[in-house]
Design a protein with these regions (language model features):
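Peripheral docking tails and interdomain loops at the edges
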Residues: 314-361
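N-terminal glycine-rich anion-binding loops that anchor highly charged ligand groups
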Residues: 6-43
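Conformationally flexible catalytic loops at phosphate/diphosphate-handling active centers
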Residues: 165-250
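Generic long, charged, amphipathic alpha-helical segments
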Residues: 270-303
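Structural signature of the thiamine diphosphate
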Residues: 139-196, 349-361
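Thiamine diphosphate
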Residues: 36-130, 142-162
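Glycine-/acidic-rich phosphate or pyrophosphate-binding loops and their flanking alpha/beta elements
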Residues: 9-13, 235-258, 271
Length: 361
């Protein structure tokens, strides 16, 4: 397939991009608002073209363990779900991180806690960047703010996952998953051959016909000293990721007196709020974390001595704001504005919050 420009939903873009980047398998289960990922893959039937496996599992728990099996054999495999379903996957995600298995997880967030609502939310930030499962592990977390980024981040997530032998997650929200935009789909990449997988993934369970020694994929280590060594090695890897893979976007920050910090769909709304504020003569810039982990701590800290205040806008009760406050270390006032339960604010609400929380005080 050649490069193609189409109008589609963010969820549909995930499915198309997965096929075009040469993914080997998808294992998932339908749940609103991300069901179109599985539906689109079923409609496209990639098993007839690229050979990609697409399977609706009997549950979210089954799906994440199928990902474990596929990733253990060195294959490019993925799953997708929405907030309650991702909670069910947490044990498997911890196992994937502990076994150092590269894979892609997509979370199109909806409101909670509990069953909550099918409307958009960003309340899974803590779960994603602080470790939703057990143990000291990290996920490489990408936060798209457009349908184009939904498509682009699939290939990027796989690239980073295999580079560091670590699970990666695309943390989107229901707005980005359901909205329709023009998207440029990449040229079709072929799936890797078995020989390429063996060469690129010498750690994988690819069989012994090539004469190599057996590989064992596990996160289990019963000797405390060895488990500590594993964890120390993991932390060294995470530090390397933090040093090399931070991504963020800055808009009109050079002359800003105030900074809006937002990710995902809220960054789009925040950018419009920034423009409205500037029309009123208020110099506002915006910083958008693209990687939620590794977090752009240094980039945010650099503005602590340059701006009068920061407003963190999120579709939650205040989660990323904690990382922003840690970044500035008390050097500048940081306030939060959020809407809960699936309500998406207007840009005017953010401007009003900026005035009330930062300017009038």
């Amino acid at each position: 397939m050649e490069e193609e420009v189409v109008l589609m939903k963010g969820n549909e873009a995930i499915a198309h991009a997965a096929i075009r980047c040469g993914a080997d398998g998808y294992f998932g289960y339908p749940i609103t608002p991300q069901s179109e990922v599985l539906e689109t893959l079923a409609e496209l039937k990639p098993w007839e073209t690229t050979g990609m496996v697409v399977l609706q599992a009997e549950s979210e728990v089954a799906a994440i363990n199928m990902v474990y099996g596929g990733a253990g054999s060195g294959k490019m495999v993925m799953t997708s779900s929405s907030s309650p379903g991702v909670s069910l996957k947490q044990e498997g995600i911890s196992y994937l991180a502990g076994a150092e298995l590269p894979c892609l997880i997509v979370n199109v967030m909806r409101g909670g806690p509990g069953l909550g609502t099918i409307q958009p939310s960003q309340a899974d930030y803590f779960q994603t960047v602080k470790g939703g499962g057990h143990g000291d592990y990290r996920l490489i977390a990408l936060a798209p703010a457009s349908v184009q980024e939904m498509a682009d981040f699939v290939g990027l997530a796989f690239e980073l996952a295999f580079k560091y032998r670590n699970p990666a997650i695309i943390l989107a929200d229901g707005v980005i998953g359901q909205m329709m935009e023009k998207v440029v789909l990449p040229v079709q990449k072929p799936r890797r051959t078995d020989a390429e997988v063996i060469e690129q993934c010498p750690w994988a369970t690819t069989g012994r016909t090539n004469g190599r020694k057996p590989n064992v994929i596990t996160s289990l280590e019963l000797k405390p000293e060895e488990m500590e060594k594993n964890n120390i090695r993991f932390q060294a890897k995470y530090k390397q990721i933090e040093e090399n893979e931070v991504r963020f976007e800055e808009i009109h920050c050079d002359d800003a007196d105030y900074l809006i910090v937002a990710f995902g769909s809220m960054a789009r709304i925040g950018q419009k709020a920034m423009e409205l504020a500037r029309e009123e003569g208020i110099k506002v810039g915006m910083l958008r974390p693209i990687t939620l982990w590794p977090f752009p701590t240094k980039a945010i800290a650099a503005y602590a001595d340059k701006v009068k205040g920061m407003l963190v806008t999120e579709l939650n009760a205040g989660q990323m704001v904690e990382d922003v406050r840690l970044a500035v270390n008390g050097k500048v006032k940081v306030e939060h504005f959020g809407r809960l339960g699936g309500i998406v604010p207007d840009p005017d609400e953010i401007v009003d919050a900026l005035k009330e929380k930062l300017i009038k005080k």
